[in-house]
């Protein structure tokens, strides 16, 4: 019998990507690719997942790329536009497991500033019996240490 299940948020329970935001702000996929590979890179975003403040993160990039200021700030201020909604089949599984009495845990890389917003956007996050959110514990996947917190 399964006693507990661990879920991730992004890519498992929710569909999110900065591309959703930048498709509204840039003209082509090529521009988006260039921006996300040279300015707001995955490595830069990972630092927020580890707990760096969005203010510090955006200040750093604006200093390097002053001509991209509005696009950089959009990543922070328009975070909700990076979301494309929940994966309903995954949420259905989550809810079914909850009804069956299975313990549910969330282990996710997320900024401590954005996770409270995610709780508002995704009410199903309140179903978890426990949550480990990278930005709050200052560890992030794929670091094995975060898994030991389960």
Residue ranges and their predicted role:
Residues 98-104:
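Short, conserved structural micro-motifs that define repeat-unit consensus positions
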């Amino acid at each position: 019998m399964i006693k507990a299940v661990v879920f991730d948020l992004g890519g498992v329970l929710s569909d999110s990507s900065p591309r959703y935001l930048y498709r509204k702000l840039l003209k082509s996929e090529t521009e988006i690719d260039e921006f996300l590979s040279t300015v707001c890179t995955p490595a830069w975003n990972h630092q927020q997942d580890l707990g760096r403040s969005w203010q510090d993160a955006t200040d750093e990039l604006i200093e390097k790329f002053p001509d991209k200021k509005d696009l950089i700030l959009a990543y922070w201020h328009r975070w909700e536009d990076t979301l494309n909604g929940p994966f309903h089949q995954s949420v259905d599984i989550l809810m079914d497991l909850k009804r069956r009495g299975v313990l549910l845990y969330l282990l996710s890389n997320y900024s401590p500033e954005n996770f409270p917003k995610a709780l508002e956007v995704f009410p199903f996050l309140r179903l978890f019996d426990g949550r480990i959110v990278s930005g709050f514990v200052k560890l992030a996947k794929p670091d094995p240490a975060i898994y030991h917190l389960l």
